[in-house]
């Protein structure tokens, strides 16, 4: 019994020496005892104990993402510069900070995507966005108080004047597909912008009560949506960097449209959009050896509508302009396709 009392007294004295309990504290945690014993062990062995780090002050910056310091080793740049720019612009971030390299911008995008996930991104309805934009324009004009002659044009669409006629374009169309790619792209650009202008003028000529109706707003929104869909195509045409296979197909479509051969133009459109390759998505090799039918799979025959979303949109916009061209510049019914589609 004396041995047990002596052991209890020794343990109590040890705990008091380690300052684990006092008059105000009658108990302690085993983790505290283990930490004290560990400190004593390191002290006996001659190791210097690091002082506990002070709590870091809270950041007062409005953007805590930019203050984050990556401690892990650098990862390879897995995105192209164009893709990095596109994603940064979608999030409203600057595409390059002062003194920032392409890799630094990629790392900044990576931090933003990790710590600030997109909250307003999802399945976007482009047509609804265009209609909302038109409604907002109506509200702005009402609040601004348009008077007089402005009331007749307050619901009009923007018209891009090309200062050309369909007869001039038909004359230019005779030289399409003769090997001059720069000239072909200029003609394609003129024709598409001319058709957008014809469409906008037709919508602007409607009565005001028709423009205000649901169907009228839908037609205006469709025109605005088509114009936004075609903007990437116009950009490629201006910079003369349209891919050769897409350029060849669009050249055939425009040529047939100017000749008012709308059935042939529709066939060329389907050839470009859907294609007729054995594997239309672009699977050209399933093993290490070439197959007998592989030489039939060219980029021209691949379904471009499956490549990416941007390409799908301007291909869809091109189809709408084909319908507008057929509606405003008719020909024999045997050469028309879905005459009353739009």
Swiss-Prot record:
Could you list this entry's UniProt keywords, alphabetically sorted.
Answer: mRNA processing, mRNA splicing, Nucleus, Spliceosome
Q: Key word Nucleus present in the record?
A: yes
Oxidoreductase is among the record's keywords? no
Q: Which InterPro entries match?
A: Prp18, PRP4-like, PRP4-like_sf, PRPF18
- Give GO cellular component annotations, separated by semicolons: nuclear speck; U2-type post-spliceosomal complex; U4/U6 x U5 tri-snRNP complex; U5 snRNP
* Signal peptide per UniProt: none
Give any single GO term for biological process. Answer: generation of catalytic spliceosome for second transesterification step
Listed Gene3D superfamilies: Functional domain of the splicing factor Prp18, Pre-mRNA processing factor 4 domain
**Family matches, as SMART domains:** SFM
Q: Which cysteines are joined by disulfide bonds?
A: none
In which domain of life is the source organism classified?
A: Eukaryota
Q: What is its main location?
A: nucleus
Tell me the compartments it is located in. Nucleus speckle
Cited Pfam families: Prp18 (PF02840), PRP4 (PF08799)
Q: What does this protein do?
A: Participates in the second step of pre-mRNA splicing.
**Family of the protein in this entry:** Belongs to the PRP18 family.
Protein name (record): Pre-mRNA-splicing factor 18
Q: Which organism is it from?
A: Danio rerio
What gene does the UniProt entry assign to this protein?
Answer: prpf18
